């Protein structure tokens, strides 16, 4: 660590073609439609605000209870409740735009055509800089198997959203054995960035009553928070190793600036802060401040310079090892 911190750090980043003033965003589904945090956070100071996933039509979501706290996070089964894209554009988006927020609209569907309809409703909408395609949804045309659990279904869902004319980021599930292949399908369908990761499948049972703790019953819910951060870091790392130039947003258990540093070093261009806002609504700006402070004290003049450094270090180490091996062999030949 430096004796004296840098006075200035360039915090700008890019996710695909989208330029952002800094790499800290809110995560979809953890702050309502974004404006709810406005009493605690200057939304314009964040990289972007990612809103709760929206379907083409209003959706009621799952029955209560919807949330259960765990030792290192929470399980939710909200069920993607929302007013629908059109109502959101009319009632919720103006408040975000007026606050100077850069908005990422998240959409979902139960069939491929649902994704197309939701995307079409975002054409020409002001203030939206990108569309996050949430494919962690049951596909009614595939026995309710998650779109995100199939490379083919992921491709079809993402391809259907091209009508929006905006940069698209595909948000993927970690509950698969072939994440890199599925990520590749999303990219081949037109997504220019990966959002890694969505929640892990989870369940909670009340031992006293012998009943499910969540209203979704045997459907369980999704685990988020610090418990899943190592899984998210691994997903970011592996996808960055496979796709050197695409945009990557790391999400899952980011609660401190140092967590953001880890995600960026694994290969993320930006991070999303979600579950942490339930405990501390100012968490996104605190993470941003912590990240900036770390950069200042560690002599990092541009935050983008630490993106993927672990891959660069590994490549350099391998290169040195090969060189040393070659030198040793050459020495033996001339011994």
Where does each model-flagged region fall?
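Alpha-helix-loop-beta-strand connector modules within alpha/beta enzyme cores
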Residues: 83-100, 148-170, 214-248, 287-301
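Glycine-rich phosphate-binding active-site loops on the catalytic face of alpha/beta enzymes
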Residues: 51-56, 134-137, 193-203, 253-254, ...
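N-terminal capping/small domains of soluble enzymes
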Residues: 1-103, 108-110
């Amino acid at each position: 660590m430096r004796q004296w911190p840098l006075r200035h750090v360039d915090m700008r980043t890019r996710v695909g073609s989208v330029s952002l003033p800094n790499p800290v965003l809110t995560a979809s589904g953890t702050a309502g439609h974004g404006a709810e945090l406005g009493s605690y956070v200057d939304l314009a100071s964040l990289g972007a605000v990612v809103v709760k996933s929206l379907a083409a039509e209003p959706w009621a979501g799952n029955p209560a209870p919807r949330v259960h706290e765990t030792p290192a996070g929470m399980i939710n089964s909200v069920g993607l409740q929302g007013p629908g894209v059109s109502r959101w554009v009319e009632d919720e988006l103006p408040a975000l735009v007026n606050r100077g927020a850069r908005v990422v609209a998240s959409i979902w569907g139960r069939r491929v055509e649902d994704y197309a309809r939701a995307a079409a409703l975002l054409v020409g909408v002001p203030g939206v800089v990108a569309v996050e395609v949430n494919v962690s949804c049951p596909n009614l045309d595939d026995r309710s198997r998650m779109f995100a659990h199939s490379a083919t279904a992921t491709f079809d869902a993402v391809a259907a959203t091209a009508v929006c004319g905006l940069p698209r980021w595909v948000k993927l599930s970690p509950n698969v054995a072939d994440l890199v292949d599925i990520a590749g399908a999303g990219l081949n369908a037109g997504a220019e960035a990966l959002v890694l990761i969505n929640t892990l499948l989870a369940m909670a049972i009340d031992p006293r009553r012998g009943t499910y703790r969540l209203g979704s019953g045997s459907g369980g819910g999704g685990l988020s928070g610090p418990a899943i951060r190592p899984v998210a870091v691994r997903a970011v790392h592996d996808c960055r190793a496979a796709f050197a130039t695409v945009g990557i947003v790391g999400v899952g258990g980011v609660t401190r600036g140092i967590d953001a540093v880890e995600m960026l070093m694994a290969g993320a261009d930006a991070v999303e802060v979600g579950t942490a806002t339930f405990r501390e609504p100012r968490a996104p700006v605190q993470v941003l401040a912590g990240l900036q402070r770390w950069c200042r004290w560690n002599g990092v003049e541009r935050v983008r310079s630490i993106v993927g450094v672990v891959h660069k270090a590994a490549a350099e180490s391998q290169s040195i090892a090969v060189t040393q091996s070659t030198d040793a062999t050459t020495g033996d030949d001339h011994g």
